[in-house]
Amino acid sequence: MELIYKYVWIVPFLPLSASVPIGSGSLLFPRATRGLHHIWALISISLLGIAMLLSFNLFLQQITGGPVYQYLWSWTINKNFSPELGYLIDPLTSIMPISVTTVGIMVMIYSDNYMSHDQGYVRFFAYLSLFNASMLGLVISPNLVQIYIFWELVGMCSYLLIGSWFTRPSAANACQKAFITNRIGDFGLLLGILGFYQITGSFKFRYLLGRSNESIASNEVSSFFATLCAFLLFLGPVAKSAQFPLHVWLPDAMEGPTPISALIHAATMVAAGIFLVARLFPLFKALPFIMNLISWTGGITALLGATMALAQSDLKRGLAYSTMSQSGYMVLALGTGSYRAALFHPITHAYSKALLFLGSGSVIHSMESLVGYCPAESQNMALMGGLSKYMPITGTTFLLGTLSLCGIPPFACFWSKDEIISDSWLYSTILGGIARSAAGFTAFYMSRMYFLAFEGDLRVNLYNDPIPFYSISMWGEKESGTFTETEMGSMPQLPGNKNSSSSEGVFQFSGKMEQFDGKPMEYLVITHPLDKGDPPYPKESDNTMLLPSLVLGLFTLFVGSIGVSFVQGEISSDILSQRLTLSMNHFHENHPENWSEFFVDAIPSVGIAFSSTFVAFVLYGPINFNFSSPYLWYKRDSRLKGIPDRFINVIYNWSYYRGYIDIYYNKIFTMGIRRLAELTYLFDRWVIDGIIDRVGILGLFVGEGMKYLGGGRTSSYLFGFLFFAVIFLLTIFIFIWIR
């Protein structure tokens, strides 16, 4: 056991040892490195697999009662300041590497096929291995300095991976947006670290947590200063975990390759902020204002992300807002003191969301064979439908992930989400209501995504098939009856004839009106020239892309069991309740309850999940009981005819335009900073530079004048004498005349 703890540093070193030679080889020997790209991928997967086995070993040691182990190595020995590196092994540390390595391996296996024809294949795997190494280094860090170093490395790798396709302007802008937004949180984190070093004189967790609480309790330090430092510390997780108001980078980060979304934005990077808050939980718990701030930030983020996902037409963006909402649940749990649930939900969510992202990648991969390489079309759910017929394995695994996120028992997310909702009710009825509302919205939009993508009939191959206009409400239009030219132009076009006004591969009005329930309905015709060379239907992905989805599907089915102890008559968690704590023992107590009480408490949340799923089925499901249209557009309109159109449009526009937050940020901050920069430029050019330039010009003229006056020529001296004599005489004459 002691030997295992002594060599824990190997866990992050293994993926690092894959990243360095791949990156160096791609720079020094690019052609040879690209020629061996599959070998490099195999090496990366193998080394991360060894790290995974070591992580499982550490986890087993901890849950069986292993001791907390810390190893420190000093950079320099100094009386006043001695920076240290090392690692800390405790139950919290031991559980995070499992999530990172298992999802990381699945993503690497998946990426080997997904990125096989990409020119940046080798570079992609170098960044991927470096990211895994950085994340593993972060979770075993014993002090704030080391955490900050790996925190920045994780952010840098995220920036590089999001911008993997940097030749696309949207991807380049997305990685810059992610980088700049995270700079705000990271700067706050740095100031908070320095502030608590001022309070405690140490960066080590074991000393810092105890010393800071003692200082606050004994009033040795101002509570305002401690609260300010804690707030600055919390800014880091707010940005990294995409919490409101620094969440705006996450949806745009979907411009990167889909496997990156599965790894960074499902299992690891988003969970890094949750890990840091959990690590510093005793410190935050001593400050009631910060705990309230954490809980409300999480609650607002959970509800905001859920509402923004309601009408997304882009498959990956819908999952991105889902990730934002679920990370809000985790922060909400930490703010309410539900420490166990807050660390249980990242585990269950990681496997479920990674499964969904990999499934979406398979869908996009297959849709590209129909619509070409165009993210606006291959990711658009309006062009999908019926994919479960052509991709049964992907459809089944996607359904498993959907049911899990909806909170349907016995899937993984049910066990953790239900506990968060229950604890939120105990903490605050308002927060409990927010959590349940977000759960209902989650079940609705996840079911909507599944029905639009996998049920019904494939819509991309429709030929002159009229569809009632109300079905386009998934784009969140301003009015349900009309489209402007601009709005029509913003709709995704089918392949073949871009920017065409004829009936060749574009959305257009058919020009006919029909009555339905006494209401005129305008039709939209999807016309698609079915070229003989185009494959008519999508195909199932290759085995190397299906295997990770199947493995993650098994995790989604059974990972929830680690939070449940099947003792007769009661439900508790030996692993999570008894061992998943820090050594400070200041955390929220989770008392066991019997099975009957548990299921009674779970009835409201499960009922909400089933109700929301049923509503999504009615609106977007494949079954048509009363009408001949196979696409259920008529039924959808008739079900909604009692709801005011204005109210529906408000909901759709709120979701489609991201709650108007991006627009507000763009007008207030982006445009404001640009205007300030322009004014600063003008002031610098015309005032600062103008004064300096004019002083120089004045000196030039004075010098030129003196040159002629002191040139040694008699005529110049005579001219100067006469000029100044005339000026003198005129001055005297004017003075006498005035008097």
From Swiss-Prot:
A GO BP entry: ATP synthesis coupled electron transport
EC number assigned by the record: 7.1.1.-
Transmembrane segments: 9-29, 39-59, 89-109, 124-144, 147-167, 184-204, 224-244, 258-278, 286-306, 325-344, 395-415, 425-445, 547-567, 603-623, 718-738
GO CC annotations on file: chloroplast thylakoid membrane
Subcellular location, principal: plastid
Topology in membrane: Multi-pass membrane protein
Catalysed reactions, as listed in the record: a plastoquinone + NADH + (n+1) H(+)(in) = a plastoquinol + NAD(+) + n H(+)(out); a plastoquinone + NADPH + (n+1) H(+)(in) = a plastoquinol + NADP(+) + n H(+)(out)
Gene Ontology terms, MF aspect: NADH dehydrogenase (ubiquinone) activity; quinone binding
Keyword Transcription regulation: no
Location relative to the cell: Plastid, Chloroplast thylakoid membrane
Key words of the record: Chloroplast, Membrane, NAD, NADP, Plastid, Plastoquinone, Quinone, Thylakoid, Translocase, Transmembrane, Transmembrane helix, Transport
Function, as annotated: NDH shuttles electrons from NAD(P)H:plastoquinone, via FMN and iron-sulfur (Fe-S) centers, to quinones in the photosynthetic chain and possibly in a chloroplast respiratory chain. The immediate electron acceptor for the enzyme in this species is believed to be plastoquinone. Couples the redox reaction to proton translocation, and thus conserves the redox energy in a proton gradient.
Record text on subunit structure and interactions: NDH is composed of at least 16 different subunits, 5 of which are encoded in the nucleus.
Family of this protein: Belongs to the complex I subunit 5 family.
Protein name (Swiss-Prot/TrEMBL): NAD(P)H-quinone oxidoreductase subunit 5, chloroplastic
Organism: Cycas taitungensis (Prince sago)
